[in-house]
Amino acid sequence: MPDVIINGPDGRLEGRYTHGTDPNAPIALILHPHPQHGGTMNNKVVYTLYHNYVRRNFSVLRFNFRGVGRSQGVHDKGEGELSDAAAALDWLQSHNPNASTCWIAGFSFGAWIGMQLLMRRPEITGFVSVSPPANMFDFSFLAPCPSSGLVVQGRADELVPEPSVEKLVDKLQHQRDITIDYRVIDGCNHFYKGHLEALDTHVDTYMDKALRQAEEAKNAPAAVDDEEPAIEEDD
């Protein structure tokens, strides 16, 4: 898990990176919670997400937003952090030019940034959004949401009430061709204390299903048109 330095839009960004062993290994970018409330790339939820993808032999990157740890710059209320995430994804793609798929996962503030990046980068295949702060930030930009994904929420979350996330999920579920797998963990607070294993299990279950479905779709035979071509009659 080497340390990496990424050239961000406002200076250097500090990251941790694991490179997949397959030359076509898929990639995943992991985004941390709010920088002004102690959020870093070493957050336990972020660490759990990171290692879930490492176990799957993804090439995985997590990094500190501007002004956090050794990353340069200052907090920019989300706008600059979105630019940081875009730069990190550029770096990840440049080191994995043959990646088969691209995933993004974020926790809290990182989930909000990740969903915005999802709207801007059509190459992102799917997402995992943990405790998206639907009561704090505007998610109306997801109109429509371009990809199916997983949302995980704690029922005892004291910072992001579960009903606010359920309302967001219901809105997304009504969009055409989009499936949101919504999982609520009973007794779980915002920081997943004592529930990291349950979170990891939900991510495992969803990723197993999503990757299996993607593989089946890729290997499915092409549809054959059974209708015979029309024969034009001579005048």
Enumerate the predicted regions with their spans.
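Serine-hydrolase catalytic machinery in alpha/beta-hydrolase-like enzymes
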Residues: I6-N96
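Catalytic histidine-centered segment of alpha/beta-hydrolase-like enzymes
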Residues: G73, C188-D200
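Alpha/beta-hydrolase fold nucleophile elbow
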Residues: N96-F107
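Gly/Ala-rich beta-loop-alpha elbow adjacent to hydrolase catalytic centers
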Residues: G106-G114
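Short beta-strand/loop motif that positions the catalytic acidic residue
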Residues: C145, L150-Q153, D157
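Short alpha-helix in the alpha/beta-hydrolase fold that links the catalytic acid
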Residues: S147, P161-K171
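Acidic catalytic loop of the alpha/beta-hydrolase fold
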Residues: A156-V160, H190-F191
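Catalytic histidine neighborhood in serine/cysteine hydrolases
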Residues: L172-F191
